């Protein structure tokens, strides 16, 4: 088996933000390679931790690493959009904290067979859950030009979405686009030479867009956070680590909405209880990685941690 190095980002900060109680019930919504899971377990005595991951490889790797799973830990091979259903199946209707570490893990990026990276020539795949049928190859070869433009613009914030989509549309009429390197060359061809020389790898934005579309990432996140806000107890917290602006804006917007005072007439001496928010932002601004972490973990550079706490039912 190939060994992949993975450094968990904001490991101590995200776990500390949960304020873990030894007898509490917690959820790690993104198991990955188990960094945050282990950190939470270190604080539990009689408590319980449910760790989710839609990637079978993550479940298998962590299971093998533990050998025998701690009695406090339950692993769930499901997307975190199934949060409520999965917890209900386990007899859990409320929890004391939930942690999300979003995006693609380093092992997923570094496994060339998964097709997540423009650095390796591999079949176009990008599925986090290998059980699903939609993959990157299907999107690139079958989705209409207009849909390609839409996802490149919306999910990749790519300025040359139309030009790239046109190149793809033209190429796939000649032969199917089946590998990451084929796609990289088409992306490069759709971006003017001057623009290719700035802003990092020219394929980065389109690969991100296709990955988000394949895995329906933003919709899954929004659905999961809505459930999480209902599941946590008073005093419970949700910690979310994001790595790109689309995720961060979604989390920021949702947290701001539920932690803000509802519309009330101006001039009221006291804001009525019905208008008071049920949640509070633990930090007004996101927590960022330390200089020390940035020096040893390049993946941490875009990370932001946002935390919210439930203060009323």
From Swiss-Prot:
EC number: 2.1.1.199
Pfam families: Methyltransf_5
EC class: transferase
Subcellular location: Cytoplasm
GO function term, MF aspect, one: rRNA (cytosine-N4-)-methyltransferase activity
Positions with a binding annotation for S-adenosyl-L-methionine: 34-36, 53, 80, 101, 108
Family: Belongs to the methyltransferase superfamily. RsmH family.
NCBIfam families reported in the protein's UniProt record: 16S rRNA (cytosine(1402)-N(4))-methyltransferase RsmH
Protein function: Specifically methylates the N4 position of cytidine in position 1402 (C1402) of 16S rRNA.
Protein name (database record): Ribosomal RNA small subunit methyltransferase H
């Amino acid at each position: 088996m190939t060994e992949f190095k993975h450094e968990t980002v904001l490991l101590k900060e995200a776990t500390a933000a949960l304020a873990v109680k030894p007898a509490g019930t917690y959820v790690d919504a993104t198991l990955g390679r188990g960094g945050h899971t282990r950190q939470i377990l270190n604080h539990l005595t009689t408590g319980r931790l449910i760790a989710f991951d839609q990637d079978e490889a993550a479940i298998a790797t962590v299971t093998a690493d533990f050998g025998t799973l701690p009695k406090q830990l339950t692993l769930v091979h499901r997307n975190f959009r199934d949060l409520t259903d999965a917890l209900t199946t386990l007899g859990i209707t409320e929890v004391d904290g939930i942690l999300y570490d979003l995006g693609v893990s380093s092992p997923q990026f570094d496994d060339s067979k998964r097709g997540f990276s423009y650095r390796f020539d591999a079949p176009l795949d990008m599925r986090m859950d290998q059980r699903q049928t939609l993959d990157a190859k299907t999107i690139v070869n079958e989705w209409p030009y207009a849909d390609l433009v839409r996802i490149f613009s919306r999910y990749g914030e790519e300025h040359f979405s139309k030009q790239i989509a046109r190149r793809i549309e033209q190429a796939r009429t000649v032969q199917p686009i089946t590998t990451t390197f084929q796609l990289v060359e088409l992306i490069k061809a759709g971006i003017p030479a001057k623009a290719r020389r700035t802003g990092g790898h020219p394929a980065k934005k389109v690969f991100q867009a296709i990955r988000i579309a394949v895995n329906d990432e933003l919709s899954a996140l929004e659905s999961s956070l809505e459930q999480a806000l209902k599941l946590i107890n008073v005093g419970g917290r949700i910690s979310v680590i994001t790595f790109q602006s689309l995720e961060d804006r979604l989390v920021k917007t949702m947290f701001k909405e539920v932690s803000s005072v509802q519309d009330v007439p101006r001039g009221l001496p006291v804001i009525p209880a019905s208008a008071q928010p049920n949640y509070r932002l633990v930090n007004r601004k996101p927590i960022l990685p330390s200089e020390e972490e940035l020096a040893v973990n390049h993946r941490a550079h875009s990370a932001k941690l946002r935390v919210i706490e439930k203060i009323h039912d």
